[in-house]
């Protein structure tokens, strides 16, 4: 069985990761951070990047030495065996019914802002977005990367244009003096802003598709992380400068409001299109990553439908299965009018648990200073689970339930059950 096609370069990797991190958050999170922390949020971004760096470095080193479509599940399997590898894979896949429909709703919301769509029109927009993801996905990782590199360029261009038109100068940035930082507001902002950096685990599934994973995967991960952090910080400066936040204003409306203020109502469509593309980019990388994880998990039976690749070395069957689940979840949620706010928090707990499992794998697989970074990253993940509070029990219950209920299977070589 031949593997996935290795076609990604450094620039494409940077585009994939930065758009997966920006995603649905770039239009909303800066306003939310400004709401809870005010000017303190300007310090929160660099602090958050410093805190995330140990986790990112561990992801980068593991991806360099053990590139696989299985991503974190593969790292965990290398460290702790195939059973926990399968549990980790299914834990990641359990986000599909909750997280992806929520992101689809956010993306379709830009259609509502532009055209006044409601109900079935928004549903059609969500299904159309999934169809576009399918088309891009069947063209290969390189096509996704090229598109998402263009999208990150548009996002950066929008922020630069706002800075230029708004005449924002470094002297005007309201940085609080270090002695005046309110720690309560800083911690509150960090708890909101961490979700902007959920995306490293999805990027890990693409490590095996780099032309030179040992060289380019770590570089793409670190540069993409810094680029996304810089864009988020620039957005926060803009939101604070124009006072475009508040309890009575939808967070995602902050940047469109600024665009209208600076460039007129006719420019609203530009902000909405870029906002939609940012959401699409995040959806795309997650769905492509889910497909590669499903394909990887099916490799124990090479003749299985989901284990097959197309003539272009693309896991189309796995992609179709993932998108089928997304369509069903979207239709059910639309029919039942389910409120996803609380469920998204539960899903975030699962992401942190996956990060924690990756750090534990790093503690076993890595040596020297990288093992120390894995320990630091693991402690940070435990702290983040504590910040989620009792809702983190959902992730713990899912982990325990999968471990106890996931059917055991025999390895064909020696008949051992795992």
Where are the model-predicted features located?
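Membrane-interface "cap" regions at the ends of multi-pass membrane proteins
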Residues: 1-31, 35-40, 44, 53, ...
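Helix-loop-helix junctions that connect adjacent transmembrane segments
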Residues: 3-4, 42, 116-128, 146-272
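Small-residue-rich segments of transmembrane alpha-helices in multi-pass membrane proteins
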Residues: 17, 21-25, 151-165, 224-232, ...
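Transmembrane helix-loop junctions in multi-pass membrane proteins
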Residues: 26-30, 104-107, 136-142, 266-267, ...
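Hydrophobic transmembrane alpha-helices that form the core helical bundles
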Residues: 32-36, 54-130, 134-138, 152, ...
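Transmembrane alpha-helical segments of multi-pass small-molecule transport proteins
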Residues: 47, 114-140, 151-163, 196, ...
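TM-loop-TM module centered on a large, flexible mid-protein loop between adjacent transmembrane helices
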Residues: 74-81, 113, 222-284, 303-342, ...
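A generic transmembrane alpha-helix motif of multi-pass inner-membrane proteins
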Residues: 360-418
């Amino acid at each position: 069985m031949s593997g996935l096609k290795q076609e990604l370069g450094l620039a494409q990797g940077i585009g994939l990761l930065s758009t997966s991190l920006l995603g649905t958050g770039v239009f909303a999170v800066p306003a939310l951070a400004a709401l809870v922390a005010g000017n303190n949020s300007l310090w929160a971004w660099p602090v958050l990047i410093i805190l995330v760096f140990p986790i990112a470095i561990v992801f980068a080193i593991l991806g360099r030495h053990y590139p696989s479509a299985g991503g974190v599940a593969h790292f965990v399997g290398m460290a702790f065996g195939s059973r926990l590898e399968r549990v980790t894979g299914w834990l990641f896949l359990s986000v599909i019914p909750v997280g992806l429909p929520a992101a689809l709703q956010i993306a379709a919301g830009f259609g509502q802002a532009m055209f006044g769509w409601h109900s079935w029109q928004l549903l059609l927009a969500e299904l159309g977005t999934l169809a576009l993801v399918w088309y891009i996905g069947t063209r290969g990782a390189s096509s996704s990367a090229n598109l998402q590199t263009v999208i990150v360029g548009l996002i950066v261009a929008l922020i630069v244009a706002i800075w230029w038109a708004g005449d924002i100068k470094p002297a005007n940035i309201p940085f609080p003096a270090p002695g005046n930082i309110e720690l309560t507001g800083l911690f509150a902002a960090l708890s909101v802003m961490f979700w902007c950096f959920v995306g490293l685990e999805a990027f890990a599934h693409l490590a095996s598709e780099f032309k030179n994973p040992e060289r380019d995967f770590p570089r793409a991960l670190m540069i993409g992380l810094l680029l996304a952090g810089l864009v988020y910080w620039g957005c926060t400066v803009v939101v604070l400068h124009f006072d475009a936040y508040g309890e009575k204003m939808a967070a995602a409306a902050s940047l469109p409001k600024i665009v209208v203020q600076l460039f007129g109502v006719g420019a609203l469509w530009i902000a909405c299109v870029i906002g939609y593309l940012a959401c699409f980019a995040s959806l795309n990388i997650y769905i492509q990553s889910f497909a590669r994880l499903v394909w990887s998990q099916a490799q124990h039976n090479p003749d299985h439908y989901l284990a097959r690749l197309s003539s272009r070395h693309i896991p189309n069957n796995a992609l179709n299965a993932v998108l089928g689940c997304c369509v069903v979840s979207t239709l059910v949620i639309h029919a039942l009018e389910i409120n996803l706010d609380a469920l998204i928090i539960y899903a975030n707990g699962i992401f942190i648990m996956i990060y924690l499992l990756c750090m534990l794998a790093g503690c076993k697989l890595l040596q020297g200073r990288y093992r120390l970074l894995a320990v630091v990253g693991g402690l940070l993940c435990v702290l983040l689970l504590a910040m989620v509070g009792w809702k983190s029990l959902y992730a713990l219950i899912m982990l325990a339930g999968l471990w106890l209920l996931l059917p055991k299977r025999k390895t064909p070589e020696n008949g051992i059950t795992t």
